[in-house]
Amino acid sequence: MSGNMTFSERHLQEARQILDAIDIAPIDRMVSILAELRDAGGRLFFLGVGGSAGNCGHAVNDFRKIVGIEAYAPTDNVSELTARTNDEGWETVFVEWLKTSRLKPTDAVFIFSVGGGDMKKNVSANLVRALEYAKKVGAKVLGVVGRDGGYTARVGDAVAIVPTVNPETVTPHSEAFQAVIWHLLVSHPRLKIQQTKWESTH
């Protein structure tokens, strides 16, 4: 990579490299799983922390409104999230939320995460606990994650890994491509049932 590049040029070049390198196969598997989930009346639960939590709330809106899937994110309910964190601890906050939501085999858990969770390193242990429960219940596990994908990639049914092209920009690219991929999904002809406003004004 040229040392004469500006930061903006380098960042956008990295984004292009990621686009060229990303594996499409797990994304197409997500489409099939989500179509089957909707047909079966299943629900979709988005889990993430930090910037990924913000993406979860946005994705919930899109999957409900555009795709017609009943979707939720525990991080959208600040009162319950903080009560569980205060009373029970951060590590179990998502798994207990899924238990209260009566997670079923017809449902799916969708992870947005930079690292995918790693119990040994004590990174996003709350995601790992939630995924352990999801697998026990028999729910599908989807994800868009960075780095090596962590625990999410190891147990997931369809997990897109955002390739690392620069170790110093893993987080911004991982979170940006979460949005790229979920917008691809809600725009996919197998999933999209509601036209978005600006595309309907031609």
How should these model regions be labeled?
Residues 117-127:
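Glycine/threonine-rich flexible loop motifs
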Residues 35-108:
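Glycine-rich, small/polar surface segments that engage phosphate groups of diverse ligands
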Residues 108, 140, 157-158:
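Well-ordered beta-strand positions
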Residues 1-22:
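Generic N-terminal amphipathic, Lys/Arg-enriched alpha-helix
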Residues 136, 145-198, 202:
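Short alpha-helices
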Residues 49-54, 116-118, 149:
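Gly/Ser/Thr-rich loops at beta-strand to alpha-helix junctions
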Residues 22-40:
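A short, well-structured juxtamembrane/interface segment
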